[in-house]
Amino acid sequence: MKTHQFSTALFSDYKQGDSFNFPCPAKLNLFLYINGRRTDGYHELQTLFQFLDYGDWLSIKVRNDGKIRLTPEIPDLKTEDNLIYRAAKLLQQKTACRLGADLHLDKVLPMGGGVGGGSSNAATALVALNYLWKTGLSVNELAELGLKLGADVPIFVHGKAAFAEGVGEKITYCEPPEKWYAVIKPNVSISTAKVFSEPDLTRDTKKKPLEQLLQQEYTNDCEKVVRKLYPEVEELLRWLVKYAPSRLTGSGACVFAEFADEQSAQTVFNLKSKQFSGFVAQGLNVSPLHKMLEQLNRQNHG
């Protein structure tokens, strides 16, 4: 695909021959609070998700023989363990669908960056194949399947900016301002498990109602520990916060700064050290994937 900024894609980009191209948008955790640890080891959270107008493309061509093929292969990851492949298989099994698919991922989002790349890929596979295979599952049924693949997958399946509580299963749709963000990835790989097992991690932030959380300054309880464990993140945030409110997304490694307009975000992004990667994108309260499906449905019923 020519662009990874979905709003600039033409409707003709969505369908090429027998293949459909579906967006897999990034996300940010605009805030993230850890309220406690359960007996099963999971952490209770309160977090606000917003999508970004930027991400991967998943191309899908339906097959009649039931086979699932996924390209390109990711080094050190078996295809059967890939979330996209697992999503397709789950949907096949759940619906007894006899169709298959050739899937190709055009990837730009960093793996393990805290921007939801793998979860977004899995959700797009579920939502898009449900549409192409005509398997007829509701959004809630797809979200339930998605939860088997990862805690963040249901948010992408629902396709609306949302406040999530508990271990991520309680979802309230939300409409935070659609600001512009400079998203930057330091050259470190962060283990979520390591962050959440760290003794110094704040685990007792008091639960608050959403209305109150939206009014106060947004922060991320993982950030203090990540800054301590990874000096590159500390250094990057110390630089970025000089220009705009900045923080970690998820458990990292990506950090982001928020701006009122694209030009301000791009100006600061251009000042970053060349050793860091990243992108500039606007926050979106409706996923580009769901906007595309609306267009396809309108065209089909038009």
UniProtKB/Swiss-Prot annotation:
Entry annotated with the keyword ATP-binding: yes
Q: What does this protein do?
A: Catalyzes the phosphorylation of the position 2 hydroxy group of 4-diphosphocytidyl-2C-methyl-D-erythritol.
Q: Does the keyword Protein transport apply?
A: no
The protein's matches in SUPFAM superfamilies, at most eight in alphabetical order, are given as: GHMP Kinase, C-terminal domain, Ribosomal protein S5 domain 2-like
Top-level EC class as recorded in UniProt: transferase
Q: Which source organism?
A: Mannheimia succiniciproducens (strain KCTC 0769BP / MBEL55E)
What's this protein's family per the entry? Answer: Belongs to the GHMP kinase family. IspE subfamily.
Write down the Pfam families for this protein, in alphabetical order. GHMP_kinases_C, GHMP_kinases_N
Pathway listed: Isoprenoid biosynthesis; isopentenyl diphosphate biosynthesis via DXP pathway; isopentenyl diphosphate from 1-deoxy-D-xylulose 5-phosphate: step 3/6
Keywords for the protein's UniProt record, in alphabetical order: ATP-binding, Isoprene biosynthesis, Kinase, Nucleotide-binding, Transferase
- Chain's gene name: ispE
Q: Which reaction is catalysed here?
A: 4-CDP-2-C-methyl-D-erythritol + ATP = 4-CDP-2-C-methyl-D-erythritol 2-phosphate + ADP + H(+)
Q: What is its EC number?
A: 2.7.1.148
Protein name as it appears in the record: 4-diphosphocytidyl-2-C-methyl-D-erythritol kinase
Task: Report the GO molecular function annotations.
Answer: 4-(cytidine 5'-diphospho)-2-C-methyl-D-erythritol kinase activity; ATP binding
**Coiled-coil region(s):** none
GO:BP terms for this protein?
Answer: isopentenyl diphosphate biosynthetic process, methylerythritol 4-phosphate pathway; terpenoid biosynthetic process
Catalytic residue positions: K27, D152
Residues bound to ATP: P110, M111, G112, G113, G114, V115, G116, G117, G118, S119, S120
